[in-house]
A protein has these predicted regions:
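Iron-associated oxidoreductase/ferritin-like identity signal
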Residues: 1-134
Length: 134
């Protein structure tokens, strides 16, 4: 159980980092694509907060202690939308990989599996969307 809680806490910290990164990028994006990407980054920040809530609930369900701080991986500060999209791709790919690992660990809990599988699908969709934006 501790291994699952630890992995979920990793996902939670990553979602908190993603929310911070996307909010930061929405504020700083410049250039001809600013309006489209500002909206995109704001939506991703909101999605990350929602994912964090679901992951936190899963940790509570397992009687674990949820982290309150974001993952410490550096957030690249830039106003260049191309770099922002590259960083977003790295973030979404890592998130999808992490959720895939968790899904392999929780196959016996249908409710939790379904909730986290939906997040995995959201992350995979984000990767595909970023491929089209890049």
């Amino acid at each position: 159980m501790e291994k699952i809680i630890s992995k979920l806490n990793g996902c939670l910290g990553w979602e908190l980092r993603a929310a911070t990164m996307y909010s930061h990028y929405a504020a700083y994006v410049k250039g001809i694509h600013r309006l489209q990407l500002k909206t995109h980054f704001e939506a991703e920040a909101t999605e990350s907060h929602g994912h964090a809530d679901i992951v936190r609930a899963a940790i509570v369900k397992l009687d674990g202690k949820a982290v309150t701080e974001r993952d410490s991986t550096k957030i690249v500060h830039t106003t260049n939308y191309e770099i922002m999209l590259e960083e977003a791709m790295k973030t979404e790919q890592r998130a999808a990989e992490s959720y895939q690992e968790v899904l392999n660990m929780i196959k016996d809990d249908d409710e939790m599996y379904d909730a986290l599988e939906q997040i995995f699908f959201d992350e995979a969709r984000s990767v595909e969307e970023l491929k089209r934006l890049s």
